[in-house]
């Protein structure tokens, strides 16, 4: 067998260039000082993936199924016709293989199982690869229903965690594979960017509400899906809301720089951002977004402080590790010692293969360095460029690497609540059989009945209800899926009806369906106490064209909204 190149030859490691030593330091196993934060972070990330797939189980047929609002099959067919072989890069989804109802359910349930494995610390690295691949498959095919910043956040965090997680079936804390410095930094970098870029867009948007500290005065009322805690917080005086707006700007633009400072300041930052995120979780239904940002904050901690904060966690994990390690032995200086599963002592050369193993092991290690170095550096470049473009739009930077990775949603630009909405509008679908009496289709999560309190749903992500909030802020021509929904309701389509809380026409379908828009306001404490109303509302008129079905089953436009 010919001699391996010097880069992969163990006999010539002393001749390796300095860049390889630097690559090992940056992308290879780091110092074992963040084993506990990694362990807890990955379990929590598994929970977030679980909630993401769990919410899709009940929605995916109605959203992108063959009879759904935006069928994935039709979209992929159009992409394939336009891009040919390039479609696999610009739409990286497994739904190219099949996109029927069964395939969509299989995607969701496989994602759920992979998320459970990640929560149980079984094959964490492989489980992450499956979670990211399957969630990306949905995101690439769902169009309007996956155009959320939180989806990009989860894909970026999941992909980076593939390099952060320890290998093996049951790695425990992964003492033999501490996280690389680069992967830890990149996850912290993502968390920093979520905060800092959100602060930047608030300033750069020119929104007077942030400038005058009035942005939070109606934030709880006008968000995508308010909850009852936010209703009570809304009743507090303006001074409280002005202080909350100022705190948000100080946190996002100033305090988050502590991510890059010394250990005591990073730990202090953890105790600042954690209650900040918990407060958002309690007062707004933003899906899994703030849960993910909260979980990323765990990486501000280290092994010296985290076990002290969660003593039961330490005891249970140590007990589990002692059981897992029983029976795995190696020899050290002629004496037996415990060898962790997946270590070289357990999987190393045996049965006369030591020569081949010794030659291939460096190849594997260096290939891993090259792979992780390439992608982590690529993502860092892209995200740095996107951040700089917020500040210097005409900066002449190469954008080809940014564009190339864009379909994978793993190097993103963030910016939450740049401009605060000043009013709340709600789209409501109504049907009729006689053209006179219109019955509303009840929603599962959106505000509708003024007497019903706004509930807490997060981290569940009701994508249909969320997107209706976005649609209410624009014209119906920008949101063709609203019209698609009307047409499908005229047919009593079961896939779309599953997105609603009920069907006012359980037998024969309606002869006409329309989408109207209401304006909603929170009531005050007195009105709620005396009348039991959480909301007051006023009808503003048609949102989209009214569709009707004639006796032959033909569907046409009956009435259009005023321009």
Regions picked out by a protein language model, each given a short descriptive name:
Residues 1-3, 434:
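Short intrinsically disordered, low-complexity coil segments enriched in acidic
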Residues 13, 320-336:
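Intrinsically disordered, low-complexity repeat regions of secreted/extracellular protein precursors
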Residues 329, 340-344, 350:
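Intrinsic disorder/low-complexity segments
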Residues 17-321, 333, 346, 351, ...:
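Alpha-helical membrane-anchoring segments
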Residues 4, 12, 331, 354:
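Cationic, low-complexity basic patches in intrinsically disordered or flexible, solvent-exposed regions
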